[in-house]
Amino acid sequence: ELRPIVDKIAVEGSYLLAEECAALLKALRSAAAIVGFITSRREGSYPRLKALTRGVEIFPELRRALERVIDDKGEVRSSASEELSTIRRAIRDHEGQVAKRLQQVLQKAKSSGIVDADAMISIRDGHAVIPVAAANKRKIAGFIHDESATGRTFYIEPVEVVELNNELRELEYEERREVVRLLTELTALLR
């Protein structure tokens, strides 16, 4: 159902979400394929369908604009803008730095007996954290993001990665702003 998407396009200042752009792109591709199939048939074939498709506009320029921004998974392409590509590269770099530093802290904590030998990095509230037994929670400097239901385990973001994680969050906010800018631009073009 495209009506809600088309209605949303009509609202000045609004923008389509990536998945809405993907749905519109899919519909435009389908329309182009159907019209192309019918019009490519030999003369005399499907006369009624040919008559129906004669006036159908398939908007190739809009389809190309959507394809430039939206990928086959319905997400905004990194290549949609140089800015987005740069931001996403920086995000990947920061994620790698955080993972490497967390792994170092975790290994040190394991060898010191502060955390269990089978402890693994996990995510709590969007932050990479280390699970630490309640008795050892003061032995790792950092920010406590969560505790287990039993209260026996605390999930700590080590101080060594707090700044890197803050930078990562800032990059994710930049990414979100750039994606919204691209989708707003694309929606205005569709309008």
Give residue spans per PLM region:
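Conserved amphipathic alpha-helical "coupling/scaffold" segments
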Residues: 1-87
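Alpha-helical coupling/stalk and coiled-coil linker elements that connect catalytic or binding modules
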Residues: 15-19, 47, 63-191
